[in-house]
From Swiss-Prot:
<dbReference type="GO" id="GO:0005524">
    <property type="term" value="F:ATP binding"/>
</dbReference>
<dbReference type="GO" id="GO:0004111">
    <property type="term" value="F:creatine kinase activity"/>
</dbReference>
<dbReference type="Pfam" id="PF00217">
    <property type="entry name" value="ATP-gua_Ptrans"/>
</dbReference>
<feature type="domain" description="Phosphagen kinase C-terminal">
    <location>
        <begin position="12"/>
        <end position="240"/>
    </location>
</feature>
<comment type="function">
    <text>Catalyzes the specific phosphorylation of arginine residues in proteins.</text>
</comment>
<keyword id="KW-0547">Nucleotide-binding</keyword>
<dbReference type="InterPro" id="IPR023660">
    <property type="entry name" value="Arg_Kinase"/>
</dbReference>
<keyword id="KW-0418">Kinase</keyword>
<dbReference type="GO" id="GO:0004672">
    <property type="term" value="F:protein kinase activity"/>
</dbReference>
<feature type="binding site">
    <location>
        <begin position="15"/>
        <end position="19"/>
    </location>
    <ligand>
        <name>ATP</name>
    </ligand>
</feature>
<dbReference type="GO" id="GO:0005615">
    <property type="term" value="C:extracellular space"/>
</dbReference>
<feature type="binding site">
    <location>
        <begin position="162"/>
        <end position="166"/>
    </location>
    <ligand>
        <name>ATP</name>
    </ligand>
</feature>
<comment type="similarity">
    <text>Belongs to the ATP:guanido phosphotransferase family.</text>
</comment>
<dbReference type="InterPro" id="IPR014746">
    <property type="entry name" value="Gln_synth/guanido_kin_cat_dom"/>
</dbReference>
<dbReference type="InterPro" id="IPR022414">
    <property type="entry name" value="ATP-guanido_PTrfase_cat"/>
</dbReference>
<dbReference type="InterPro" id="IPR000749">
    <property type="entry name" value="ATP-guanido_PTrfase"/>
</dbReference>
<feature type="binding site">
    <location>
        <begin position="193"/>
        <end position="198"/>
    </location>
    <ligand>
        <name>ATP</name>
    </ligand>
</feature>
Amino acid sequence: MVQWISPLDNSIVIASKVKILRNIKGIKFTKLLNEEEFNDLLSMVLGRLKEIDILDKCYVVKLKDGEEKIIDYYKENFGLIKYFENKDNLIFIMNKNGEFNILLNEEEHIGIECTNSGLSLREVYSKVDKLDDLIEEKIHYSFDSELGYLTSNIKNLGTALRTKVFIHLPLLSSNNLIRIIKNALKEEGITLKSIYNSGNKDVGNIYEVSNIKTLGMSEKDILDSLISITNKLILREKNQRDNLSKDEYIELKDDILRALGVLRNTYSIDRDEALKYLSYVRLGVELGIIEDLTLKPVNSAMIEIQPDMINNSSIKRRDIQSLKIERAKIIRNALNT
């Protein structure tokens, strides 16, 4: 499993993720392929990947047939479950060691992605780039000398590189600075958004920082920009923590320990309340207030309590009350061991 769940330190940055998108020269975009054309594409790509010994180290799973392994995939990739338009034809090629994943027929013909803990964008990109170079030796990509890599979505033209950092910003969020920061980052071609929401409200204080532009920038420029922005966010969050008054710190410490007490003893809890308290607990670990926990069980709990994750682990879909009870059980098991 990818190591972001077991971080090496109590970092504010949870994980870094890089994804590159590629289309194959002379083949219609994914959304335009019929069943026969897709099967031809799949056969060709898998054949070429065998030639470079990638598949020996991977699981090859169709989304509609491999639910259990796909659940593990989402856990490894920060639990971002979404619904795919072309579910029947989506293929996951998952490295057995969790080093990378290749998606066939998702947004484009080929998507190569990797996730790892902390602020490690350059290291993660290096892995993806090496794999991309290997594949390109066997497959001719759609490329234009002026536009770069050609994609069905104009937003991905150019490098077709997507970079993301997942970061915990509880103090910036509680002081209502997030909206101001979001607007400022848009001007720099960066998106900041909560990965968990309830209506229009951010929940859980975990944010995704990602690049918007892929055209007109080099891969190095994109990586440098996101790393620079992330470091500024880290500094601003740390400043908020360091500048707490004595009374504010006491109040925060009380909130953290109350949250830990609730989560370790709750019998039934809804998702939003659980994420709120897990954010407090995570902050407590980051600040050294909670000493008998690491971030690993907190990270795992944040993923496993999502409704889709709970339902996917059950034979039948649960009702709301059953979900709340099972969610509380997951949290108790995570935080009491």
